[in-house]
Amino acid sequence: LHMKLHSFPTRRSSDLVFCLPPSIQPDIHPENIPLDILYEDRDVIIINKPKGMVVHPAAGHYSGTLVNALMYHCGEDLSGINGIMRPGIVHRIDMNTTGSIIVCKNDKAHNCIAEQLKEHSITRKYHAICYGVIKDDEGTINKPIGRHPTDRKKMAVNEKNGKEAITHYKVLKRFQNYTYIECQLETGRTHQI
């Protein structure tokens, strides 16, 4: 086995020691945040998530998330499949996207909805306003999306390290410098739209 440490080759008799800091699991608390509930029954709750709200706690966003609001609204009645940081969450939408999100209240519903998303029997459509005038009335964008090569906070088309991202679009209306479109996603990559 040929290895390097800090660009220097290691010797066959060398020992490599890894010191990993303990992972810190932040405390996630219920918060009384108003929810725009589109539908609710004993298995699922469908929320119209507003722009600016993060779906689940993550680095830099441990409060004010949809999960914090759901914990307050639903109490213990959320699927535990995705753990304490994502109770009930089957899919996500970006922080700056407004749209419907299905949340599962039990593991049976979670497995059922996850399978439907995987099999594409649930259709996800979004409306978006794009800068520029799109010439074709409809089309498909099939480009891999991954981290931007120089700005890790951004996503970009990344042929080398990106994951498959397929978006079908249909032009609804054209304006002088913008196009209003409907998008149907086959995949669900961060910042895909």
Residue map of PLM features:
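Short, exposed "boundary/linker" segments that immediately precede the start
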Residues: 1-6
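Thr-Gly-centered strand-to-loop micro-motif
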Residues: 56-57, 104, 155-157, 181
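Short histidine-centered loop motifs in beta-beta connectors
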Residues: 176-184
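Short beta-strand segments enriched for Tyr within beta-sheet-rich domains
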Residues: 113, 190-193
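Short flexible coil/turn linkers enriched for glycine and charged/polar residues
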Residues: 41, 95-96, 122, 163, ...
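Short coil-to-beta-strand transition motifs
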Residues: 27-32, 158-167
